[in-house]
């Protein structure tokens, strides 16, 4: 069927900020979809609140709106643009929920706007637990016994009838939010109450638990002519009971017989046809390992995380084709872009194994609840491709960047057998490593299968890896053993460990016997047809399919999996760098391991290597491609950490040189450079042991800021107020980076701001200064940032620009640089310098219109700022005010304290832009879901050192009609100062303590600060947790509360009696 001519203008709804459960895969899907629709000649209007994405770049759509994804703002944009149709299926759960809201509000009918891709009825049938159950019964598809509840009592009654364990699944939520497995009535009451609150339709499904069944996923596509196909089938290593986003996944399925595969395939196609979905859809099924019995778990009637994985695993561009299907094209008339000859109707065939392992944030959140269940906790994921399961699994392990090069954690060798068995039974984020340790200790795979319900096939593969380790131990320097180990994915580093040699010795031995990896192409058709795509993975076989081109090439290193501190912003910079390399006439090669991102879309670069970002894997690609040089400054700390080893191996690092990277990272060298350049910094010293640290703190004076050197995202950074706390920090936290000393700095509580600069070593372009709303002490990634600055004098701004220029030239910066400053008593101090792209690059690029990563790349390749038409110094400011606000995922992470501090905790960001600060702030708060009522009750529970400042805020809240409530100490202080506050009870006073008031909806906001020492007491943490659980705005920094107050005051009228 030809594409539709009756629609011209299509609105695409993005997925908003990155949170756990909805990450960069939607940037990838949305970007593909917008470009596909433009390719077909439609006018595309995009709305999304996330500035860190490629999707929100001007050239991706005809018009891009970076506005809050709320009914209020989307409605305004629709009325302004009058699109003929809306495509909501590429914006994750956010997009679907927005489509439902627009429909319920009557806006779609009122303006005669059509929904493309998935009908509202299909969204309802797949997402509404009751309708889904009815549809499955009509189709004769088995689902676990279940009931829909609207109250906790209904849930309890059902569970008493069918027995425990049961699973709770709230309707219309994302990543299993609010759900869980319940083994007792107490757990059921707690989880159901929370689930009903989080479900926008106050509805939960309570179903019999089928934990222990195999979990299988089918990624299917259908068009308007009812053609349907399976793009990819995937099997979870972990059985049912763990969210698929938190499971290790293999594609294609590994343990199914042909009969089982056909049975589940038929079920999936039957379901997508019944739902009449036009586009992509994900079906999750549970299969009894001992019979042909199966259940349908759920259906996602949209592009999902699994579709991004399926796209990258097969090379089949699901989102691109889903967008074209939505406008009427059919699978049998679209060419598969990978082969360029076959049609999209061909089901992909795989002649390799793909492994996906989730990346969890528990290196950041040591106290987080690591137990995995039906609610997702991973922030990102890695993918690896190999010719056998062992190879793909081991490549994925070393892609995780958690300090392992193999499925082994050396620290586990010290734990007792008893603890080991407990960890194997309890599914936590690191269970793979405990399973492997158990096999090394001689536990049989049959024992492990009965404890974990993980299929024997997978456990046998782990056993095989251990057997190869043993073979290596017995045959040191044996060539055949080396060949075998390499064929099954062992790294040089692991082999070196076993043979007690250096990694370089193994590399030399391989080279002396011409043992190099070859690169195979991902071609969707198991080499049946010629493929046109330059998308490769390494393996140790005979035939190499990747040929070095005649053109000079440049290798760009990506940033690996998304984690807190290193998000999609670095992928944004990578993609822009590649564009600039191509424009300059070079071949651009990307190397990355993250299946969710735009950078690993094979159409972005001239060549894509889907490989771990380790020294060995990068060197193998360099040996083959012989690039002119490697660019490391866009891949976050991942790529920067490889620079030294690559440089020592004779590789040309383009841009800022390794010794200059070192000068910015190494404390003593940096201090020396600042002295030479005449730039002040907070007093500080380096310490390599406890004695030196105490000596330094004594000399500088408490409070001090302590942190390890060479870290990203404020990992293990703390503000310490006395000697005892400092000793405790050194003994517990410095594990973060053992080879490097710790830094002890004077802690200055002043205004923070940061600058991104671009230089070629002679002149420096400063696109803009971003002023932080929160004062020093809150990590820059968790602060709200304002551009242009609202409270910095012209003189301060000039000083900042001058220091930035001196730093860029003094540190021989070629490309990008980020500098953070703190200002106290009109004195500007430099806190830190990062000689690489930072997380603010996308935001600043969007608000200034300067394509920063592209310009930086052109400078790296030898052009000057003058050549590109830019002048030295600070770029003229924009007329609008722009706010970048952080977004957190605390609802997904039990036991992680939401108190903000020097360690980064946010997972994403949103942007608000308008003509005034108040309007921009309002948009930013709306976009990050901090919606505050115009009036109500606000609770203050404040540390002694900030009570005076909190008092003036409380007075202002009272003036606009809020009722002030406070805890005992705070209320007493307010009363002394003449402000009466309603006293709330101590934690445990069941009737009126804060958690109880919050639970019953009596509190509209909480302001809670702790002293500089920051030791969060149990009560404070309970208060903060209750706010997070119930979705009540929580402010742990007075500056954020002040910003919110500014918005409320600007929206209030003055009402006074005459």
Curated annotation (Swiss-Prot):
<feature type="binding site">
    <location>
        <position position="778"/>
    </location>
    <ligand>
        <name>ATP 2</name>
    </ligand>
</feature>
<feature type="binding site">
    <location>
        <position position="752"/>
    </location>
    <ligand>
        <name>ATP 2</name>
    </ligand>
</feature>
<dbReference type="GO" id="GO:0004088">
    <property type="term" value="F:carbamoyl-phosphate synthase (glutamine-hydrolyzing) activity"/>
</dbReference>
<feature type="binding site">
    <location>
        <position position="284"/>
    </location>
    <ligand>
        <name>Mg(2+) 1</name>
    </ligand>
</feature>
<feature type="binding site">
    <location>
        <position position="169"/>
    </location>
    <ligand>
        <name>ATP 1</name>
    </ligand>
</feature>
<feature type="binding site">
    <location>
        <position position="176"/>
    </location>
    <ligand>
        <name>ATP 1</name>
    </ligand>
</feature>
<feature type="binding site">
    <location>
        <position position="300"/>
    </location>
    <ligand>
        <name>Mg(2+) 2</name>
    </ligand>
</feature>
<feature type="binding site">
    <location>
        <position position="834"/>
    </location>
    <ligand>
        <name>Mn(2+) 4</name>
    </ligand>
</feature>
<feature type="region of interest" description="Allosteric domain">
    <location>
        <begin position="930"/>
        <end position="1058"/>
    </location>
</feature>
<dbReference type="GO" id="GO:0044205">
    <property type="term" value="P:'de novo' UMP biosynthetic process"/>
</dbReference>
<feature type="binding site">
    <location>
        <position position="210"/>
    </location>
    <ligand>
        <name>ATP 1</name>
    </ligand>
</feature>
<feature type="binding site">
    <location>
        <position position="832"/>
    </location>
    <ligand>
        <name>Mg(2+) 4</name>
    </ligand>
</feature>
<keyword id="KW-0464">Manganese</keyword>
<comment type="similarity">
    <text>Belongs to the CarB family.</text>
</comment>
<comment type="function">
    <text>Large subunit of the glutamine-dependent carbamoyl phosphate synthetase (CPSase). CPSase catalyzes the formation of carbamoyl phosphate from the ammonia moiety of glutamine, carbonate, and phosphate donated by ATP, constituting the first step of 2 biosynthetic pathways, one leading to arginine and/or urea and the other to pyrimidine nucleotides.</text>
</comment>
<comment type="pathway">
    <text>Amino-acid biosynthesis; L-arginine biosynthesis; carbamoyl phosphate from bicarbonate: step 1/1.</text>
</comment>
<feature type="domain" description="ATP-grasp 2">
    <location>
        <begin position="671"/>
        <end position="861"/>
    </location>
</feature>
<keyword id="KW-0028">Amino-acid biosynthesis</keyword>
<keyword id="KW-0547">Nucleotide-binding</keyword>
<dbReference type="GO" id="GO:0005737">
    <property type="term" value="C:cytoplasm"/>
</dbReference>
<dbReference type="InterPro" id="IPR016185">
    <property type="entry name" value="PreATP-grasp_dom_sf"/>
</dbReference>
<dbReference type="InterPro" id="IPR011761">
    <property type="entry name" value="ATP-grasp"/>
</dbReference>
<dbReference type="InterPro" id="IPR005480">
    <property type="entry name" value="CarbamoylP_synth_lsu_oligo"/>
</dbReference>
<feature type="binding site">
    <location>
        <position position="777"/>
    </location>
    <ligand>
        <name>ATP 2</name>
    </ligand>
</feature>
<keyword id="KW-0479">Metal-binding</keyword>
<dbReference type="GO" id="GO:0006526">
    <property type="term" value="P:L-arginine biosynthetic process"/>
</dbReference>
<feature type="binding site">
    <location>
        <position position="175"/>
    </location>
    <ligand>
        <name>ATP 1</name>
    </ligand>
</feature>
<dbReference type="InterPro" id="IPR005483">
    <property type="entry name" value="CbamoylP_synth_lsu_CPSase_dom"/>
</dbReference>
<feature type="binding site">
    <location>
        <position position="832"/>
    </location>
    <ligand>
        <name>Mn(2+) 4</name>
    </ligand>
</feature>
<keyword id="KW-0055">Arginine biosynthesis</keyword>
<keyword id="KW-0665">Pyrimidine biosynthesis</keyword>
<feature type="binding site">
    <location>
        <position position="832"/>
    </location>
    <ligand>
        <name>Mn(2+) 3</name>
    </ligand>
</feature>
<feature type="binding site">
    <location>
        <position position="707"/>
    </location>
    <ligand>
        <name>ATP 2</name>
    </ligand>
</feature>
<feature type="binding site">
    <location>
        <position position="780"/>
    </location>
    <ligand>
        <name>ATP 2</name>
    </ligand>
</feature>
<dbReference type="InterPro" id="IPR036897">
    <property type="entry name" value="CarbamoylP_synth_lsu_oligo_sf"/>
</dbReference>
<feature type="region of interest" description="Carbamoyl phosphate synthetic domain">
    <location>
        <begin position="547"/>
        <end position="929"/>
    </location>
</feature>
<dbReference type="GO" id="GO:0004087">
    <property type="term" value="F:carbamoyl-phosphate synthase (ammonia) activity"/>
</dbReference>
<feature type="binding site">
    <location>
        <position position="820"/>
    </location>
    <ligand>
        <name>Mn(2+) 3</name>
    </ligand>
</feature>
<feature type="region of interest" description="Oligomerization domain">
    <location>
        <begin position="402"/>
        <end position="546"/>
    </location>
</feature>
<feature type="binding site">
    <location>
        <position position="298"/>
    </location>
    <ligand>
        <name>Mn(2+) 1</name>
    </ligand>
</feature>
<dbReference type="Pfam" id="PF02787">
    <property type="entry name" value="CPSase_L_D3"/>
</dbReference>
<feature type="region of interest" description="Carboxyphosphate synthetic domain">
    <location>
        <begin position="1"/>
        <end position="401"/>
    </location>
</feature>
